[in-house]
């Protein structure tokens, strides 16, 4: 089984203010950890605007470009910042998502991992927020559907915060099954079980603070995995956030490292039976 690793040094050009929780060092440490692994290392291309326009209007792209500072930082809100290299980093991240889908669907690799930043699952169609500028996971799903002609794609989003942006971008897309687990109550306040999408293809699994990995595993076994099997996706996209870890200070789901391993391996195993192992 071949796994592609898509990343680019430009993703390190998105610089946040001192003390910000989403910082360059996060990606640097991931890349160091991946160095000894046998992966097909692939440079993430810059996303082209025709691809980005599948999920964002031109006005969103223009407003990001207009807000770029010549030096220092530009605050878009209390959490979300731009530095001079932020847009280039974001376009590399989005390009990685598109390229990963291309590689997996073509059969060049079995699956792919995008080590990118800034993150994306809070970015709505016209609003950057929560550290996020572009909706990478939603873009990957739309690219698989509209460019490659797939009929059904699943997106699984695990994070301590709900992926409100991915949900907004895919809420009326009946060809995508979106499954999301998140701590509730917690910012951004969305992700309740009553948010099911226009075509009943959104599954939210809110988890209580401190509930830990046992509650997560029960939720996925009882709700997520049966829905995936019923939906029969041709590709599974994992939108992975690791702030549910017990060592992360921002919230309190208290997952262990093994919980993340278990969930990823279970999703890959399901993909083996459902969609030829195709996972991004």
Predicted regions and their residues:
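HDAC/HDAC-like amidohydrolase catalytic core signature
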Residues: 1-156, 161-280
């Amino acid at each position: 089984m071949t796994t592609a690793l898509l990343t680019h040094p430009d993703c390190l050009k998105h610089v946040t203010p001192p003390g910000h929780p989403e910082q360059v060092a996060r990606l640097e440490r991931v890349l160091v950890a991946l160095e000894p692994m046998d992966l097909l290392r692939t440079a993430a291309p810059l996303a082209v605007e025709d691809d980005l326009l599948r999920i964002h209007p031109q006005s969103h792209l223009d407003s990001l470009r207009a807000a770029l500072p010549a030096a220092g930082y530009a605050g878009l809100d209390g959490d979300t910042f731009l530095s001079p290299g932020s847009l280039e980093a974001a376009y590399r991240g989005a390009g990685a998502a598109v390229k990963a889908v291309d590689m997996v669907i073509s059969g060049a690799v079995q699956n792919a991992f995008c080590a990118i930043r800034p993150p994306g699952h809070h970015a709505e169609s016209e609003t950057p927020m929560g550290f996020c500028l572009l909706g990478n996971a939603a873009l990957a799903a739309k690219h698989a559907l509209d460019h490659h002609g797939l009929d059904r794609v699943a997106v699984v989003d695990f994070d301590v915060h709900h992926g409100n942006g991915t949900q907004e971008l895919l809420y009326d897309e009946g060809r995508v099954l979106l499954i999301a687990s998140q701590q509730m109550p917690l910012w951004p306040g969305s992700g309740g079980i009553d948010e099911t999408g226009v075509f009943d293809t959104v599954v939210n699994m809110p988890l209580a603070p401190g509930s830990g990995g046992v509650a997560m595993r029960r939720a996925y076994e009882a709700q997520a995995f049966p829905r995936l099997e019923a939906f029969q996706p041709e590709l599974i996209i994992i939108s992975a956030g690791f702030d549910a870890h017990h060592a992360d200070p921002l919230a309190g789901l208290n997952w262990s490292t093994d919980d993340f391993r278990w969930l990823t391996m279970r999703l890959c195993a399901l993909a083996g039976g459902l969609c030829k192992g195709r996972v991004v």
